[in-house]
């Protein structure tokens, strides 16, 4: 029986605790909702739930402190008052946000015995217990306070911090404005700030002054160039080298003192370098036109030299191939140049050299007459230089091989008209090689010159 009674008692206690927690949650929610509605109606702007909860919890904390540390005399009751609703309705632009002007004001009233303050449940939650009373909202009028009444204004802060400050009693009003009737329109002492003080009333707007006319721009004075630095002083003359020490000698007879005029003269100072005169620059500018004219004359001379070289190369190649082509059925053996590879090679190179020289001769004549070349300028110099180098190598190669073959024929069969005519053609090919070498130098100059 004892165990059953204890279990039943525990279940009843648990059910009562759950019922108390539910009632406490409902009362907290109802208190928060009522506070938000009344504060919104008073201030004209919505109030957040956390502000109401903060004020309610602060009142509970105050009740706990008063219960833990009782004071002699009447116990103050807590009244939650929104700070200056009349001012907020009249001048909404001059008030701070409503979250920073919710005030908690405690006034002392006579009470015979301290009433039990609301405490938190044993569950450790932040809600109000079952017997917590809903805090009333202050009306426009309130009962008179006793002579020893004090005023405690607690200002709710933002969600980061809160501050409380004791403010002495100033009037019998329970509103946040200690001077409600002065200045018209709900008092002129200002709002209670976060630290318990009052902010000053905003000054009347001043009439905007007309902007002064812009100052005229200042004239910029020309900057004077600093004078040129003085020339550096001449370097000091080197000290004369001391003569080598002379070994002591027997004393000589005393000589007359040397007059001061006979001493060595001091070295003359080195003259400072003279600044270049401005006419030197004009002299270099005057040399531009003669340089251009001399460049043109040099280019014309090079063209005439190249024209003569091309004509000579064409004539020599034509003579060499004609002599070698006529060397057929000559000598005692009735031999011909076409029977030998070296002679055919020399004949082909002379034909190519003749055709190329004629083409270059015609192109130079057109350039000198009409100032227009058959090949564009960027490619012309490279083409001339390459062809001159190749034909020069081919001429010296073919002439050398033909010379070796003629020497072999003379050594084996003796001298007759056939090798003699071949020797004549080879000699003319060597002369054509020399002319092509000169043409190669001219084309290299035209390719790599910088005055183009």
UniProtKB/Swiss-Prot annotation:
Residues 1-39, 71-147, 164-283 are annotated as: Disordered. Keywords: Cell membrane, Glycoprotein, Membrane, Transmembrane, Transmembrane helix. Glycans are attached at residues 339, 423. It comes from the Eukaryota. Residues 25-34 have a biased composition (Polar residues). It is a multi-pass membrane protein. InterPro entries: CASP_dom. One of its GO terms (cellular component) is plasma membrane. Residues 327-347, 407-423 are extracellular. Residues 105-126, 190-205 have a biased composition (Low complexity). Residues 211-272 have a biased composition (Pro residues). Homodimer and heterodimers. Belongs to the Casparian strip membrane proteins (CASP) family. This is CASP-like protein 4A1. It comes from Sorghum bicolor. The lineage of its organism: Eukaryota, Viridiplantae, Streptophyta, Embryophyta, Tracheophyta.
């Amino acid at each position: 029986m004892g165990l059953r009674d204890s279990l039943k008692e525990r279940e009843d206690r648990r059910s009562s605790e759950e019922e108390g927690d539910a009632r406490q949650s409902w009362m907290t929610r109802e208190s928060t909702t009522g506070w938000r509605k009344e504060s919104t109606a008073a201030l004209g702007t919505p109030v957040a739930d956390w502000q109401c909860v903060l004020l309610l919890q602060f009142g509970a904390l105050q009740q706990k402190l008063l219960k833990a540390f009782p004071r002699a005399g009447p116990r103050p009751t807590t009244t939650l008052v929104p700070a200056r609703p009349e001012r907020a309705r009249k001048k909404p632009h001059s008030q701070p946000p409503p979250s920073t002007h919710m005030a908690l004001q405690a006034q002392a009233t006579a009470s015979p015995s301290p009433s039990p303050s609301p405490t938190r449940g044993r569950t450790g939650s932040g809600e109000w217990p079952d017997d917590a009373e809903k805090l009333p909202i202050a009306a426009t009028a309130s009962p008179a306070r006793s002579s020893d009444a004090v005023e405690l204004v607690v200002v709710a802060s933002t969600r980061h911090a809160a501050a409380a400050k004791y403010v002495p009693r100033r009037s019998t009003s329970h509103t946040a404005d200690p001077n409600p009737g002065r200045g018209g329109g709900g008092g002129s002492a200002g709002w209670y700030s976060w630290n318990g003080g009052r902010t000053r009333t905003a000054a009347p707007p001043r009439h905007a002054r007309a902007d002064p006319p812009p100052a005229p721009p200042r004239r910029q004075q020309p900057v004077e160039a600093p004078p040129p630095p003085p020339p550096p002083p001449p370097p000091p003359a080197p000290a004369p080298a001391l003569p080598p020490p002379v070994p002591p000698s027997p004393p000589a007879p005393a000589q007359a003192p040397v007059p001061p005029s006979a001493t060595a003269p001091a070295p003359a100072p080195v003259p400072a370098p003279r600044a270049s005169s401005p006419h030197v620059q004009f002299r270099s500018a005057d040399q531009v036109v003669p340089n251009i004219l001399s460049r043109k004359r040099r280019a014309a001379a090079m063209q005439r030299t190249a024209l003569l070289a091309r004509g000579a190369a064409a004539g020599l190649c034509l003579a060499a191939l004609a002599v070698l082509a006529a060397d057929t059925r000559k000598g005692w053996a009735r031999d011909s140049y076409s029977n030998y590879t070296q002679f055919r090679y020399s004949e082909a190179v002379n034909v190519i050299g003749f055709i190329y020289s004629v083409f270059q001769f015609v192109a130079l004549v057109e350039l000198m007459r009409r100032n227009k070349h058959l090949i564009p300028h960027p490619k012309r110099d490279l083409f001339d230089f390459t062809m001159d180098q190749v034909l020069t190598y081919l001429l010296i190669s073919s002439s050398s091989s033909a010379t070796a073959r003629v020497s072999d024929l003379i050594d084996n069969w003796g001298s007759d008209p056939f090798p003699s005519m071949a020797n004549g053609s080879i000699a003319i090919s060597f002369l054509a090689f020399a002319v092509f070498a000169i043409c190669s130098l001219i084309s290299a100059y035209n390719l790599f010159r910088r005055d183009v």
